[in-house]
């Protein structure tokens, strides 16, 4: 790996998921537009790792290594195959996907997940269940994302779990990445892992875990708002201006609403 590629990779993979297009534009300027394909390839890796949604009209599809098929991706539930522009995150060249049907376990998990997401996430949340190749395991993924660059914030919720049918176990991780940059720059990241555990109902186990995660997240943020953020008001000797972090950050929504806005 070249030094340039390492630097670009570090920058991209440390960026808020909803600001990648801005990062791409700036990297193009810094590299004089000479490394467009190399940068785009790294961003594709980033998008797959973060399971970013690609949009076509009102439809949104998840992108990951689980549903990659050649240069395209497939949606096992909606039975479509689609290409993705990883910079604009637009889906295109959509065609019918007929390579394989969803299994009964996959369909049942999707139906239960759909009910859970509709009850606890914004309408814009995207989710799916992918069968992990050469195993009796399923990847359960939920993404809730939104941005308002004009209002200086972006938010991204990603939860991903692996359900093992043979062992009736569930394991996974949930993470939140919220960036607020009006008159300052505050980025809040939090992650929690669900260790492998027995389950009679994977989606119920996910719901219980995420409810506890969100409670802890809100408590943690309230503590920071009352302590660290207040302290920042006394550390601005250059501009001699005070930023009301308590009020600004206190109005920012976290948890499942991290991507919903005020």
From Swiss-Prot:
Presence of keyword Chaperone: no
Keywords: Actin capping, Actin-binding
Alphabetical GO biological process terms: actin cytoskeleton organization; barbed-end actin filament capping
Gene Ontology CC terms, in alphabetical order: actin cortical patch; F-actin capping protein complex
Family matches, as PROSITE patterns: F_ACTIN_CAPPING_A_1 (PS00748), F_ACTIN_CAPPING_A_2 (PS00749)
An example molecular function term from Gene Ontology annotations: actin filament binding
InterPro entries from the UniProt entry: CapZ_alpha, CapZ_alpha/beta, CapZ_alpha/beta_2, CapZ_alpha_1, F-actin_cap_asu_CS
Pfam families cross-referenced by the UniProt entry: F-actin_cap_A
Keyword Cytoplasm: no
Sequence intervals crossing the membrane: none
Assembly description: Heterodimer of an alpha and a beta subunit.
Family of the protein in this entry: Belongs to the F-actin-capping protein alpha subunit family.
Chain's role: F-actin-capping proteins bind in a Ca(2+)-independent manner to the fast growing ends of actin filaments (barbed end) thereby blocking the exchange of subunits at these ends. Unlike other capping proteins (such as gelsolin and severin), these proteins do not sever actin filaments.
Protein name per Swiss-Prot or TrEMBL: F-actin-capping protein subunit alpha
Source organism of the structure: Kluyveromyces lactis (strain ATCC 8585 / CBS 2359 / DSM 70799 / NBRC 1267 / NRRL Y-1140 / WM37)
